[in-house]
Amino acid sequence: MGMILKRAAVLALAMLAAMGASARTISAAEYKERMIAGWIGQIAGVVWGAPTEFKFKGVIAPDSALREWVPSMINEGFDQDDLYVEMTFIETLDKYGLTVDIRQAGIDFANTRYKLWCANAAGRTNLRKGIAPPDSSHPAFNRYATAIDYQIEADFSGLISPGCPQRVLELGNLFGRLMNYGDGVYGGQFVGGMYAEAFFETNRVRIVEAGLACIPQESLYAQMVRDMLKWYRNDPKDWKLAWRCAKAKWRENSDYQKLSSGDIDVKINGAMVLLGFLWGGGDPENTIRIAARGGYDSDCNPSSAAGVLFTSLGLKNIPAKYYTALDRSKKFSFTAYDFPSLIEVCERLARKVVLKEGGKIRKDSNGKEIFIIPQNAPAPDGYDIAWAPVRPEGCRYTSEERARIRAK
């Protein structure tokens, strides 16, 4: 046994050396286990917070507003738009590959039949009118350009990109620009970046810092993240004090409300995600409860916070009450996926991402698959200012493309 372990270690070192730059490794089995945990966290967060959604705006919800968790609640997630919308993007990637262009992504989104709101609804309406992306998200055509929408849907981008933050950015530019602009896109890239890091990191501050590295540092969203980190370092116990600080600056101060989407704005809701993720102390229930009690979009916010946390913890470290009752045969609304097939497609895409980002997939001496992933720093694009945007590009679908948009 000792000789086998030694050979495995030598093989791993040789593969790392062959990569040249520093690399991180994760077994395929551990990747899958953490990715499953991330989806469980998303589902648990959204269903637990759902009864409070937008009922508490600018006030802290009482603890009594949240039900006690019972295992069967996990099956309330199959009809949640917070989950099935991002599965449209997963299906597009699986069908057309990682190099799918934004126009095709827009056609697929335009053809969806589920009900949408805010930036998602405006973006899809624009697409159906023939306004091709990225113009479909431009503030000239979309009054909700800085709303929370892509932040809600970006979980998939990190779950299929373990340790690959640049791929998270590219997926954000591909799908986030269908409906969001500027900070509206950056919120999703930030969340996706946290997921990508959570496969390798348990320190919550470092996970947040990894997400922060994925977005333009001069953006308002980045300023909000730095504020939340500062307030956490100043007082990691009093989440209600941090909530009051976030509300005062990121919801009530007019200097930070330029082209704001109000209570659905990505920045105040991103602050509530971090409220739960940081002040929750790494505890699943505390994380969800705090993020939900922060109010505003209080099902989406605990979903994002719990999804990242559960990915970091891994399935083995999550209380079984969150997943033992999951119906594995039921399909998510408007999708072809039940839970096992969702996990299967995400694992398939993750393998492609690892290779596309310059990584390798090898077997050790025991036949166990190992993902070897180069540590490449993300390179965010320039800052798109939503209240002073560049001119629309004049993107329009051709008549042939419009003929492929069947929904009206």
Model-derived regions, located:
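Acidic, carboxylate-rich catalytic segments that either coordinate divalent cations
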Residues: 222, 229-259, 312-408
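Bacterial N-terminal signal peptides
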Residues: 8-18
